Amino acid sequence: AEFGLIDNGGDIVLFSNRDVRVGIFAGNAPSSGKFAFVVPPQKEILGICTSSATVGPSVSFGTADAVVCFSRNPAHADAWATSLCNVITPENFSDVVPTESSLCGVYAVSGDWVGTCGVLPRVVPANVDAGLITRG
């Protein structure tokens, strides 16, 4: 296959022979729904997982509107997104995001603050259609 994408309510696994736009939804944060990642073609599986303390039914011990983690191992992307969402703040971002791990990159949103770390796909302006957002 040349293209495969599985989306399970904020957790995405993909490989693709073309660019794929992935909208960034962060609840009531000012940037929510206004930007998307442009994920370039992937010959290997890429996990893109999001956790939120303010969106959805999952229990979170944090305050972030969205923590998006990228990893070649989708289970690691999911685990890191959940773990980081439980503890991340604008003040501690650089201290809690690991520099050496299976993560490719982290994109975090908390209110009007955005933090990034590692290698991330290009972020472009977008008009994310809320009707296309999957529910886990």
Briefly describe each language-model feature range:
Residues 1-136:
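Mature catalytic core of soluble alpha/beta enzymes
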